[in-house]
């Protein structure tokens, strides 16, 4: 019996060190794909030695897949003059990747797929409507400069999707209101974390590994670690976080920044100007296993974003037993309970510093098991399994109907 084919479209290479929740989610969908499915990924090449424009047999997280790199993208953590999404979409034209199921994690590439047959699903990871209205750096996203053009494109493309999944309840509701004729296709979907990678340690193990990290960084054994992980882009507002560290009047606290991006140089400059070089370590992009280790031993994870969906990194922190401090953005404030984190009502260095201080001084109020409990419903094996089960059921019904018609 033929297997149903799922083709995933996104502008990255899963074997390259890359930063971002979308990439992590796609990797998880591939890892936990049931054997009943054939999985394909249309992505990018990581260097000039890789063959471009041909299907290649590959393996990811123990799963055999077919991989099609559209073009070479050597560093997707830093944006170029021409947005990567534009390059990726342009490279899609003239090709046909028709499949039983097609998952798009950006809207724009689906322009090339308008006439393709098969069931298409759009995953919405951020609230684009909030992004286009956000104040601040105009380089945050291209569409902020041309919101009318984006919404015109959205109106053109949205009807082709059989399903529209959003990890942001407000965004899902807005899509239902904007497109009432397809409101039954729009649904909220839980983001998910891989609990085989992100899990808590015992208190003794945690303290021992924390001391080891402090020793490696030539810091006091009493150091309390604050972890930030994500792209250094305007959306994440790392400058706000650095200023919050300057406002945090707590000895033996140290910020770990795991990530890279276009604001890396600006962040380094801010650190130097505020005299924080001894209180902040920039780690750059790190492998997921190393990130998981940092989640397990940090005292608190911090999210300073201007806008979000439900960032995977928050689920990963909670699943590792680490409390979260966040600005009021996206789904994270709805996820956190009083014993798993703190939501800052104001996006200011002082407010963020006060929230960090609250968790650092009173860890007993944010026990590890409370954090793990908050993340538990989002475990990947359960969330991803349910999505695939629904897909397979629809595929079987469609094929049974086709066979019945033939007979």
Outline where the language-model segments fall.
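A conserved mid-protein helix/loop that constitutes part of the nucleotide-sugar donor-binding site
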Residues: 21-27, 224-247, 262-268, 350
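Active-site proximal beta-strand in glycosyltransferases
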Residues: 101-103, 114-136, 143-144, 165, ...
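Membrane-proximal helix-turn-helix segments that form the acceptor-binding/catalytic region
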Residues: 144-164
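Carbohydrate-associated surface elements
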Residues: 170, 192
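Short alpha-helical donor nucleotide-sugar binding micro-motif in glycosyltransferases
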Residues: 285-286, 293-298
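Aromatic "clamp/platform" in nucleotide-sugar-dependent glycosyltransferases that forms part
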Residues: 306
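Short hydrophobic beta-strand element within catalytic cores of glycosyltransferases
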Residues: 323-326
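Conserved acidic donor-binding segment of nucleotide-sugar-dependent glycosyltransferases
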Residues: 338, 342-349, 358-363
């Amino acid at each position: 019996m033929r297997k149903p084919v799922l083709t995933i479209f996104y502008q990255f290479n899963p074997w390259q060190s890359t930063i971002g929740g979308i990439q992590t989610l796609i990797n998880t969908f591939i890892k936990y794909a049931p054997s009943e499915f054939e999985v394909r990924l249309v992505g990018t090449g990581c260097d000039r030695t890789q063959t471009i424009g041909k299907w290649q047999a590959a393996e990811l997280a123990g799963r055999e897949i077919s991989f099609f790199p559209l073009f070479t993208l050597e560093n997707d953590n830093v944006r170029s003059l021409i947005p990567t999404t534009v390059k990726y979409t342009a490279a899609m034209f003239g090709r046909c990747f028709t499949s039983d199921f097609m998952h798009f994690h950006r809207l724009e590439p689906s322009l090339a797929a308008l006439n393709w047959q098969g069931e298409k699903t759009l995953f919405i990871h951020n609230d684009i409507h909030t992004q286009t209205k956000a104040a601040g750096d105009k380089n945050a996203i291209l569409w902020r400069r041309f919101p009318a053009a984006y919404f015109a494109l959205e109106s053109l493309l949205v009807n082709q999707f059989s399903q529209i999944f959003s990890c942001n309840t407000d965004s899902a509701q807005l899509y239902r209101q904007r497109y009432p004729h397809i409101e039954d296709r729009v649904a909220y979907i839980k983001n998910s974390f891989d609990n085989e990678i992100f899990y808590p340690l015992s208190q003794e193990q945690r303290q021992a590994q924390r001391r080891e990290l402090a020793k490696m960084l030539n810091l006091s054994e009493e150091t309390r670690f604050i972890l930030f992980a994500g792209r250094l882009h305007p959306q994440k507002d790392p400058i706000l976080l650095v200023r919050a560290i300057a406002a945090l009047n707590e000895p033996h606290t140290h910020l770990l920044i795991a990530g890279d991006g276009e604001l890396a140089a600006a962040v380094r400059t801010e650190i130097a100007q505020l005299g924080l070089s001894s209180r902040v370590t920039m780690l750059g992009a790190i492998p997921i296993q190393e990130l998981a280790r940092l989640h397990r031993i940090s005292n608190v994870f911090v999210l300073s974003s201007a806008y979000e969906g439900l960032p995977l990194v928050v689920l990963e922190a909670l699943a590792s037993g680490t409390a979260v401090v966040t600005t009021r953005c996206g789904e994270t404030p709805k996820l956190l309970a009083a014993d798993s984190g703190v939501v800052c009502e104001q996006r200011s260095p002082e407010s963020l510093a006060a929230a960090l201080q609250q968790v650092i001084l009173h860890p007993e109020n944010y026990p590890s098991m409370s954090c793990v409990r908050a993340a538990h419903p989002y475990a990947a094996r359960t969330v991803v399994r349910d999505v695939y089960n629904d897909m397979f059921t629809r595929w079987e019904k469609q094929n049974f109907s086709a066979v019945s018609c033939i007979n």
